[in-house]
A protein has these predicted regions:
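Donor-binding/catalytic cores of nucleotide-activated saccharide
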Residues: 1-86, 113-117
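Residues within HEAT/ARM-like alpha-solenoid scaffolds
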Residues: 72, 94-98, 124
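Hydrophobic core segments within long, regular secondary-structure runs in both alpha-
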Residues: 75-82, 104, 123-134
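P-loop NTPase catalytic cores that bind/hydrolyze ATP
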Residues: 94-117
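Basic, ligand-binding patches in group-transfer machinery
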Residues: 116-223
Length: 223
Protein backbone atom coordinates (compact mmCIF):
# COMPACT_ATOMS: atom_id res chain seq x y z
CA UNK A 1 0.00 0.00 0.00
CA UNK A 2 1.06 3.59 -0.52
CA UNK A 3 -0.38 5.42 2.46
CA UNK A 4 2.24 4.38 5.02
CA UNK A 5 5.42 5.01 3.06
CA UNK A 6 7.89 7.84 2.62
CA UNK A 7 9.47 7.68 -0.83
CA UNK A 8 12.57 9.54 -1.97
CA UNK A 9 11.52 11.89 -4.77
CA UNK A 10 14.80 11.28 -6.61
CA UNK A 11 14.06 7.54 -6.61
CA UNK A 12 10.46 8.16 -7.72
CA UNK A 13 11.49 10.43 -10.58
CA UNK A 14 14.38 8.24 -11.73
CA UNK A 15 12.07 5.25 -12.19
CA UNK A 16 9.19 7.27 -13.67
CA UNK A 17 6.67 5.92 -11.19
CA UNK A 18 3.07 7.08 -11.50
CA UNK A 19 -0.19 5.83 -10.10
CA UNK A 20 -2.69 4.72 -12.76
CA UNK A 21 -5.79 6.91 -12.83
CA UNK A 22 -9.51 6.11 -12.72
CA UNK A 23 -8.94 2.68 -11.22
CA UNK A 24 -9.12 1.18 -7.74
CA UNK A 25 -6.05 -0.30 -6.00
CA UNK A 26 -3.78 2.07 -7.91
CA UNK A 27 -1.07 1.58 -5.27
CA UNK A 28 -0.41 -2.11 -6.09
CA UNK A 29 1.25 -1.71 -9.53
CA UNK A 30 3.53 0.99 -8.11
CA UNK A 31 4.57 -0.20 -4.66
CA UNK A 32 5.47 -3.78 -5.65
CA UNK A 33 7.86 -2.67 -8.46
CA UNK A 34 9.11 0.04 -6.10
CA UNK A 35 10.20 -2.52 -3.50
CA UNK A 36 11.91 -4.61 -6.16
CA UNK A 37 13.86 -1.68 -7.64
CA UNK A 38 14.85 -0.06 -4.34
CA UNK A 39 18.45 -0.38 -3.14
CA UNK A 40 17.25 -0.44 0.46
CA UNK A 41 14.02 -0.21 2.45
CA UNK A 42 13.81 0.90 6.07
CA UNK A 43 10.96 -0.49 8.15
CA UNK A 44 9.57 1.32 11.19
CA UNK A 45 8.47 -1.08 13.94
CA UNK A 46 6.14 1.40 15.64
CA UNK A 47 2.49 1.41 14.61
CA UNK A 48 1.96 4.55 12.55
CA UNK A 49 -1.27 3.69 10.74
CA UNK A 50 -4.42 1.86 11.77
CA UNK A 51 -6.85 0.48 9.21
CA UNK A 52 -10.41 1.27 10.27
CA UNK A 53 -13.41 -0.91 9.42
CA UNK A 54 -16.03 1.60 8.33
CA UNK A 55 -19.71 1.34 9.19
CA UNK A 56 -22.56 2.57 7.04
CA UNK A 57 -22.58 3.33 3.33
CA UNK A 58 -19.12 4.87 3.08
CA UNK A 59 -17.09 1.66 3.13
CA UNK A 60 -13.46 1.26 2.10
CA UNK A 61 -12.72 -0.33 -1.27
CA UNK A 62 -11.57 -3.53 0.47
CA UNK A 63 -14.96 -3.71 2.21
CA UNK A 64 -16.74 -3.34 -1.16
CA UNK A 65 -15.42 -6.61 -2.56
CA UNK A 66 -18.89 -7.68 -3.70
CA UNK A 67 -18.73 -4.93 -6.35
CA UNK A 68 -17.62 -6.53 -9.62
CA UNK A 69 -16.01 -3.29 -10.82
CA UNK A 70 -13.86 -3.57 -7.71
CA UNK A 71 -12.90 -7.15 -8.63
CA UNK A 72 -12.14 -6.34 -12.26
CA UNK A 73 -9.99 -3.37 -11.22
CA UNK A 74 -8.07 -5.59 -8.82
CA UNK A 75 -7.38 -8.13 -11.56
CA UNK A 76 -6.34 -5.29 -13.89
CA UNK A 77 -3.69 -4.06 -11.45
CA UNK A 78 -2.52 -7.64 -10.84
CA UNK A 79 -1.95 -7.88 -14.58
CA UNK A 80 0.14 -4.69 -14.40
CA UNK A 81 2.36 -6.34 -11.81
CA UNK A 82 2.46 -9.52 -13.91
CA UNK A 83 3.74 -7.44 -16.83
CA UNK A 84 6.43 -5.84 -14.64
CA UNK A 85 7.56 -9.31 -13.52
CA UNK A 86 7.73 -10.54 -17.11
CA UNK A 87 9.95 -7.61 -18.07
CA UNK A 88 12.15 -7.35 -14.98
CA UNK A 89 12.05 -10.22 -12.48
CA UNK A 90 14.23 -13.29 -12.97
CA UNK A 91 14.17 -14.74 -9.42
CA UNK A 92 11.87 -17.76 -9.33
CA UNK A 93 11.25 -17.42 -5.59
CA UNK A 94 9.71 -13.99 -6.22
CA UNK A 95 7.48 -15.37 -8.94
CA UNK A 96 6.36 -18.11 -6.55
CA UNK A 97 5.69 -15.54 -3.81
CA UNK A 98 3.63 -13.45 -6.24
CA UNK A 99 1.52 -16.42 -7.32
CA UNK A 100 0.92 -17.35 -3.69
CA UNK A 101 -0.02 -13.80 -2.69
CA UNK A 102 -2.45 -13.44 -5.58
CA UNK A 103 -4.28 -16.59 -4.46
CA UNK A 104 -3.97 -16.18 -0.70
CA UNK A 105 -4.91 -12.49 -0.47
CA UNK A 106 -5.86 -10.62 -3.62
CA UNK A 107 -8.29 -13.05 -5.25
CA UNK A 108 -9.51 -14.68 -2.05
CA UNK A 109 -11.17 -11.40 -1.05
CA UNK A 110 -13.69 -11.99 -3.84
CA UNK A 111 -13.91 -15.76 -3.51
CA UNK A 112 -14.99 -15.32 0.11
CA UNK A 113 -17.90 -13.11 -0.92
CA UNK A 114 -19.69 -16.11 -2.43
CA UNK A 115 -21.94 -16.41 0.64
CA UNK A 116 -23.29 -12.89 0.06
CA UNK A 117 -23.98 -13.23 -3.68
CA UNK A 118 -26.80 -14.81 -5.62
CA UNK A 119 -26.09 -18.13 -7.34
CA UNK A 120 -25.75 -16.44 -10.73
CA UNK A 121 -23.44 -13.73 -9.41
CA UNK A 122 -21.33 -16.31 -7.58
CA UNK A 123 -20.91 -18.31 -10.78
CA UNK A 124 -20.01 -15.16 -12.70
CA UNK A 125 -17.37 -14.28 -10.10
CA UNK A 126 -15.97 -17.82 -10.23
CA UNK A 127 -15.64 -17.72 -14.03
CA UNK A 128 -13.81 -14.38 -13.98
CA UNK A 129 -11.30 -15.56 -11.38
CA UNK A 130 -10.93 -19.01 -12.96
CA UNK A 131 -10.06 -17.44 -16.32
CA UNK A 132 -7.38 -15.25 -14.73
CA UNK A 133 -5.87 -18.16 -12.77
CA UNK A 134 -5.72 -20.42 -15.83
CA UNK A 135 -4.07 -17.66 -17.82
CA UNK A 136 -1.54 -16.55 -15.22
CA UNK A 137 -0.94 -18.80 -12.19
CA UNK A 138 0.54 -22.33 -12.19
CA UNK A 139 -2.19 -24.60 -10.86
CA UNK A 140 0.25 -26.40 -8.56
CA UNK A 141 0.36 -23.20 -6.48
CA UNK A 142 -3.14 -24.08 -5.26
CA UNK A 143 -1.75 -27.23 -3.62
CA UNK A 144 0.57 -25.08 -1.47
CA UNK A 145 -2.29 -23.17 0.15
CA UNK A 146 -3.78 -23.92 3.59
CA UNK A 147 -6.46 -26.61 3.54
CA UNK A 148 -9.64 -24.54 3.25
CA UNK A 149 -8.06 -22.06 0.83
CA UNK A 150 -6.98 -24.95 -1.37
CA UNK A 151 -10.39 -26.61 -1.25
CA UNK A 152 -12.16 -23.35 -2.10
CA UNK A 153 -9.99 -22.89 -5.18
CA UNK A 154 -10.53 -26.50 -6.23
CA UNK A 155 -14.28 -25.86 -6.06
CA UNK A 156 -13.85 -22.61 -7.97
CA UNK A 157 -11.79 -24.20 -10.73
CA UNK A 158 -14.49 -26.87 -11.06
CA UNK A 159 -17.18 -24.15 -11.07
CA UNK A 160 -18.81 -26.01 -8.18
CA UNK A 161 -20.73 -23.10 -6.71
CA UNK A 162 -22.57 -25.11 -4.04
CA UNK A 163 -19.38 -26.63 -2.63
CA UNK A 164 -17.62 -23.26 -2.61
CA UNK A 165 -20.46 -21.72 -0.62
CA UNK A 166 -20.50 -24.70 1.79
CA UNK A 167 -16.74 -24.40 2.39
CA UNK A 168 -16.90 -20.66 2.99
CA UNK A 169 -19.91 -20.94 5.30
CA UNK A 170 -18.11 -23.60 7.34
CA UNK A 171 -15.04 -21.35 7.52
CA UNK A 172 -17.12 -18.44 8.85
CA UNK A 173 -19.22 -20.45 11.30
CA UNK A 174 -17.03 -23.29 12.59
CA UNK A 175 -13.38 -23.13 11.48
CA UNK A 176 -12.30 -21.30 14.63
CA UNK A 177 -13.37 -24.36 16.65
CA UNK A 178 -11.47 -26.88 14.50
CA UNK A 179 -9.60 -29.52 16.50
CA UNK A 180 -6.14 -30.52 15.27
CA UNK A 181 -4.57 -33.84 16.26
CA UNK A 182 -1.00 -35.05 15.86
CA UNK A 183 -0.51 -38.33 13.99
CA UNK A 184 3.16 -39.27 13.83
CA UNK A 185 4.94 -36.24 12.40
CA UNK A 186 1.77 -34.76 10.93
CA UNK A 187 -0.98 -32.49 12.21
CA UNK A 188 -4.43 -33.40 10.91
CA UNK A 189 -7.49 -31.17 11.04
CA UNK A 190 -10.65 -32.90 12.27
CA UNK A 191 -12.91 -31.47 9.59
CA UNK A 192 -16.45 -32.76 8.98
CA UNK A 193 -16.37 -35.42 6.26
CA UNK A 194 -18.53 -33.26 4.01
CA UNK A 195 -15.85 -30.55 4.11
CA UNK A 196 -12.41 -32.21 3.97
CA UNK A 197 -11.40 -35.86 4.30
CA UNK A 198 -8.31 -38.05 4.46
CA UNK A 199 -4.89 -36.74 3.46
CA UNK A 200 -6.48 -33.48 2.31
CA UNK A 201 -6.88 -32.53 5.99
CA UNK A 202 -3.10 -32.48 6.58
CA UNK A 203 -2.28 -29.08 8.14
CA UNK A 204 1.39 -29.70 8.94
CA UNK A 205 2.85 -27.42 6.27
CA UNK A 206 0.44 -24.60 7.03
CA UNK A 207 1.23 -24.73 10.75
CA UNK A 208 4.97 -24.72 10.02
CA UNK A 209 4.58 -21.76 7.68
CA UNK A 210 2.62 -19.67 10.18
CA UNK A 211 4.60 -20.64 13.27
CA UNK A 212 4.31 -18.00 16.00
CA UNK A 213 7.39 -15.80 16.26
CA UNK A 214 8.22 -12.79 18.37
CA UNK A 215 10.73 -10.00 17.86
CA UNK A 216 13.44 -9.44 20.49
CA UNK A 217 13.90 -5.74 21.17
CA UNK A 218 16.39 -5.87 24.03
CA UNK A 219 18.65 -8.31 25.85
CA UNK A 220 20.24 -7.51 29.23
CA UNK A 221 22.72 -9.48 31.34
CA UNK A 222 21.81 -9.81 35.02
CA UNK A 223 24.49 -10.71 37.53
Amino acid sequence: TSWNKLILKEFWDRNHFEFPERILYEDIPVTIPMHYLANNVTMVQDVCYRWRIRDGANKSITQRADDFTNMRDRITVLRMVDKFFEENVKEQELWDAKYYKWLYIDLMIYVNNCIYLSDNRTLEMMKIIKDYIEETIPLETIDKLPVLYREKYVALMNLDEKRLVKLRQYEVDNYKNLKIVKKGNKYIGKFPKAIVTGDKADMTEALDQWRLTQLIYDVAWQK
